[in-house]
Amino acid sequence: MILFTTLILFLLTIPLSAQVNEDLFNAMDTSTEQISLLPSSMVFTQRLLWGEKGLMRKTNLMPLSVENREKEMKVRRKMLLAHQVIGYATLAGMVAQGVLGTQLYKGNYDLKDTHELIGNATTISYFTGAGLSLFAPPPLISRKKEGMSSIKAHKWLATIHFSAMIATNLLAEENKKYHRAASYTLFGSYAAAVLVFKF
């Protein structure tokens, strides 16, 4: 009787384990088919160039493939490194602008041309750095962390300093009081965005 019961239990478990193994293999097959080469979310500028229907894909310059995504990661790294270097140069330009602007407000108008020249160079470097960040290929995966992170703070501050940069340039000739307020907002938020990665 014990032998008969053991035999029946043994025979009943064989088909069950085979089904579990089949389900496991089926799950593995479907999971490999669903691997995406692009992250689930991208900035609209990245989607414009690097998305599945982006300009790089449609023009066939960088068709979506594993090999090309590896190349894109190298391009991304170089673009973000350049973004960082240009960011430091832009910050230095903003400091110089602060010194020159203060002298202008004190009545030293001999520095007006220098202030405008450095202002234009700083604006060009600012938007070049912003473009490198906004148009870099997207990361492999989207990392969404709960709570505050240095990258979230950097992006929030970028929204502030981007708006302040536009306001500073628009108000340069129109209204000195608001130009100064916009430039202080620009410098404060930009410096904080640079420093947020250091701490």
List PLM regions with ranges.
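Bacterial Sec-dependent N-terminal signal peptides
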Residues: M1-V20
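Hydrophobic alpha-helical membrane-anchor/signal-helix detector
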Residues: R76-Y105, T114-P137, K152-E173, H179-F199
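Intrinsically disordered/low-complexity terminal segments and short unstructured peptides
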Residues: F4-T5, L12, D29-S31, F44, ...
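Juxtamembrane helix-capping/reentrant segments at transmembrane boundaries
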Residues: K145-A153
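N-terminal targeting leaders of membrane proteins
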Residues: L16-D113, G129-K145
